[in-house]
Design a protein with these regions (language model features):
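Extracytoplasmic ligand-binding site segments that recognize negatively charged/polar headgroups
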Residues: 1-143
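Periplasmic-binding protein-like
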Residues: 46, 72-85, 115-125, 166-190, 204-218
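Loop/turn elements at helix/coil->beta-strand transitions in domains of secreted/extracellular proteins
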Residues: 73-76, 130-131, 149-152, 169-172, ...
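Short amphipathic alpha-helical coupling segments at ligand-binding clamshell hinges
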Residues: 63, 117, 193-205, 213-214
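Short, hydrophobic alpha-helical packing/hinge segments within bilobed ligand-binding/sensory domains
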Residues: 142-145, 198, 211
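A bilobed periplasmic-binding-protein/Venus flytrap-type ligand-binding module shared by bacterial periplasmic
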Residues: 49-56, 91-92, 183-197, 213-216
Length: 218
């Protein structure tokens, strides 16, 4: 975003720089439109959510609040080792609204008091004798921790959970309440020695066939 504002990376003209979809839909309408800037073209859209091992729980978790409910759902939880997404799910589970606007989570997190509130929620979970936390850093870890029985619930990426459940037959069930959408995208540095070829490569990497093919691996 800063690079775009400072003119370091190229601002795309989507209908000129990228091909239309096979059905003729212009690129400007075909791409996910909520990119962070006009200098970004997305290649992956995925969810941060949580999942559970259905063999280890007697009841069915359905909400973010259930992730923190160790009385009804005892057992350890796996959470990301960074504050990323942890603050959001903690506040959402504590009753703060999700979405856009002054009364919603990201606006509230500008206030240190809400950061403390989220951290206290996480700390309580990790120190709960009926709960406890295992921290993960690699995307493969959450389903592995669930499958091994080390944890009963884990935050993670929807594609990893899906692969474990469908591809490996693991008893892993995803919960979508409070999911956070995330994406990855490309940018093109302005004024490079091979900018025309780089733009062609970028258009090829983000065409419909290539992006659809990435679903085999995500």
């Amino acid at each position: 975003i800063n690079g775009c504002d400072e003119g370091i990376v190229v601002e795309f003209d989507f209908d000129k720089d990228f091909p239309p979809a096979p059905d003729g839909t212009p690129a400007r309408e075909d791409f996910f439109t909520d990119m962070p800037s006009k200098c970004a073209v997305g290649n992956i859209l995925y969810s941060w959510n949580y999942a559970y091992n259905s063999d280890l729980l007697k009841s069915t978790p359905k909400t973010l609040k259930d992730f923190f409910n160790t009385k009804r759902f005892p057992g350890k939880r796996a959470i990301y080792k960074s504050a990323l997404t942890n603050l959001e799910i903690a506040l959402a589970a504590d009753g703060v609204k999700m979405g856009k606007g002054g009364e919603f989570i990201y606006k509230k997190l500008e206030d240190p008091a809400y950061v403390d509130r989220a951290m206290n929620k996480i700390k309580a979970l990790c120190e709960d004798p009926n709960g406890g936390c295992v921290f993960w850093s690699a995307g493969a870890q959450p389903p592995e921790l669930l499958m091994s029985g080390e944890v009963v619930m884990a935050t993670g990426w929807n594609g990893r959970f899906f692969n474990a459940a469908v591809g490996e037959g693991a008893p892993i069930v995803q919960v979508w309440d409070g999911q956070g959408l995330d994406y990855e995208y490309f940018a093109l540095v302005k004024g490079g020695p091979n900018q025309a070829d780089a733009m062609k490569a970028l258009a090829m990497m983000t065409n419909t066939e290539m992006l659809a093919g990435s679903a085999k691996y995500i």
